From Swiss-Prot:
It comes from Haemophilus influenzae (strain 86-028NP). It holds the Pfam family SDF. Gene3D superfamilies: Sodium:dicarboxylate symporter (1.10.3860.10). Involved in the import of serine and threonine into the cell, with the concomitant import of sodium (symport system). This is Serine/threonine transporter SstT. The keyword tRNA processing does not apply. One of its GO terms (molecular function) is neutral L-amino acid:sodium symporter activity. It is a multi-pass membrane protein. It catalyses: L-serine(in) + Na(+)(in) = L-serine(out) + Na(+)(out); L-threonine(in) + Na(+)(in) = L-threonine(out) + Na(+)(out). HAMAP family: Ser_Thr_transp_SstT (MF_01582). One of its GO terms (cellular component) is plasma membrane. GO terms for biological process: serine transport; threonine transport. The keyword Cell wall biogenesis/degradation does not apply.
Length: 414
């Protein structure tokens, strides 16, 4: 096989098919690495795992710069008086997150789950009140712009890019062209990085399955079934209903496209931030309004947290059922609201949704000791829970953005 054919095989054709091939090869390497270790003298899965580490690192590195220039260029070049769809998208984000939490409450009662609490996890850094979560968000907004980029504080990056973009709307055309050229240049770099996704998935799958395997999840089958089942129900029932409300036609082709193109990558990177470039590429292919998606997708990565709301709710109710506590409907409804609010701030908390479990548990008087043990359970099942949560969160960002953009096209065509 010559070099050009090898390059064509590895980097051209359907990205989804190439990612699927990387997934299968990763599973194969994970299965054979242990038997081969004595023969070759090293763990093959650990060695190829560096490909996944490099891929995720590259995505996370380019994401802040991409957001900064893309949002700033889009707003600076936006004609004054042009209608914005951001209000409708934010409403969908918040509504989708609340409905996900509410569905999780129902699932938690229909399928009550108990877990064995034995291990403890440090919860000292967990926020103690909703106000603390909101305060963290405010601090992230007013962060130094260079610090926000260096530390990948996406709320801060978004705030500064929006501010500068609006301020530069009256700048000269030459300045606006420079911003657009920078945004285009970063987008091309993103395209190159995404072309390496099959290698990244290959490394991530091989290392993850070899390191933890699926044996560690055996004791939490019911909890995982309720968690993942609720997330799938949200992705394929709740979200399509919201999308149909906007586009007034069969939502499933769009839903499936977003799950396939965005959700699969997010599942393996386990990072909404790292998946922002993937979502922006998908939005381009869907021919969505750049001025809309360049803002809504980074924003969604920070506040559109249906998966996190489900995780917080299900694990909190698992603690409730394990302790044999009685919960009223009003308390459950309050849990939905608190979980949705906490989820929106999950991106501003180290450890994400898991470290917000003590906050939700405090609604029912559950001790920090028990809540900390639930965090430990979350880390054990994280190999599937965190991956599925991220896939739901990230794919919904581009899904809701597309729904609102398509609604606008439908209204303009009418």
């Amino acid at each position: 096989m010559n070099t050009s054919r090898l390059f064509s095989l590895l980097f051209q054709g359907s990205l989804v098919k190439r990612i699927a091939a990387g997934l299968v090869l990763g599973i194969v390497v994970a299965l054979i690495s242990a038997p081969l270790q004595e023969t070759i003298g090293f763990n093959l899965a650990e060695k190829v795992g560096v490909l996944g580490t490099i891929f995720v690192k590259a995505l996370r590195a380019v994401a802040p710069i991409l957001i900064f220039f893309l949002v700033m260029a889009a707003l600076a070049n936006r004609k004054i008086g042009t209608k914005s769809n951001m209000k409708e998208i934010i409403v969908l984000y918040l509504l989708g997150t609340f409905l996900a939490a509410f569905v999780a409450v129902i699932a938690g009662f229909v399928f009550p789950t108990e877990v064995v609490l034995a291990t403890k996890e440090d919860a000292s850094s967990a926020p103690q009140a909703v106000g603390q979560v909101l305060f963290t968000l405010i601090l992230n907004v007013v962060d130094n712009p260079l610090n926000a980029i260096f530390k990948a504080n996406f709320i801060g990056v978004l705030a500064w890019s929006i501010g500068l973009g609006l301020a530069l709307r009256h700048a000269s055309d030459a300045t606006k062209n420079v911003l657009s050229d920078f945004a285009e240049g970063v987008s091309k770099i993103v395209h190159v990085i995404i072309s390496f996704a099959p290698f990244g998935v290959f490394g991530l799958v091989a290392e993850t399955l070899s390191d933890k395997g699926l044996v560690a999840l055996g004791g939490y089958v019911q909890l995982l079934a309720v968690l993942i089942g609720t997330m799938l129900f949200t992705a394929f029932v709740v979200n399509p209903i919201l999308v149909y409300w906007k586009i007034r036609r069969n939502p499933y082709p769009l839903v499936w496209t977003c799950v396939r193109e965005s959700g699969v990558t997010a599942f393996f990177t386990r990072s909404s931030a790292a998946n922002i470039p993937v979502n922006i590429e998908l939005a381009k292919r869907l021919n969505l309004d750049e001025e809309t998606y360049s803002v809504s997708i980074p924003l969604g990565a920070n506040i559109n947290m249906a998966g996190a709301a489900i995780t917080i709710t299900i694990l909190t109710l698992a603690a409730v059922h394990t302790l044999g506590l009685e919960v009223s409907f009003v308390s459950a409804l309050l849990l939905s609201i608190v979980a949705a609010l906490c989820a929106c701030g999950a991106s501003g908390v180290a450890g994400g949704s898991l470290l917000l479990i003590p906050l939700a548990c405090s609604l029912f008087g559950i001790s920090d000791d028990v809540a900390a043990q639930m965090i430990g359970v979350g880390f054990i099942i994280g190999i599937l829970q965190d991956s599925t949560e991220t896939a739901l969160n990230s794919s919904t960002d581009v899904l809701f953005t597309a729904a609102v953009c398509m609604e606008e096209e439908r209204k303009n065509a009418a």
